[in-house]
Amino acid sequence: MNHAKQESEVMNLPSTIEVYCVERSLPGLTEKQLADVHWALLRTVERVAKNGGQIRYVRSTFIPDQSRCICIFESSSRELVRTVNETAQIPFTRIENALDFNFLGG
């Protein structure tokens, strides 16, 4: 069994999910504070998934010159993505549906 399938099963993800992009402005954060944001999201997603929520935190990318952070989630709903971010108490500007072409490889 491949790793991706195992991970999806652990995170309660259905076979068809949506990809969501969460955009945030995080001016003045240190690398340590950015790492704390990452870990807060991981812990919150894990807790929500263990309680039956169909969500996975994929990754974040920080753009230092713009103090902008883009976080990618896979989830059964935008509302669940919103709930995770609000529960983690990480401010965000917006949540949008997205396409993730990472599966194409490189």
Model regions and ranges:
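Short S/T/G/P-rich N-terminal loop/turn motif that feeds into the first structured element of a domain
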Residues: 1-50, 83, 101-106
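Residue-level signal for beta-strand positions within conserved beta-sheet cores that form or flank
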Residues: 18, 53, 91
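Short, well-ordered beta-strand segments in beta-rich or mixed alpha/beta enzyme
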Residues: 20-24, 58-85
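Surface-exposed loop/turn and secondary-structure junction residues enriched for glycine/proline
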Residues: 29-32, 58, 65, 93, ...
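Short, glycine- and small/hydrophobic-rich beta-strand elements in well-ordered beta-sheets
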Residues: 45-68, 96
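An amphipathic, aromatic/His-enriched active-site/gating alpha helix that lines ligand/cofactor pockets
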Residues: 74-102, 106
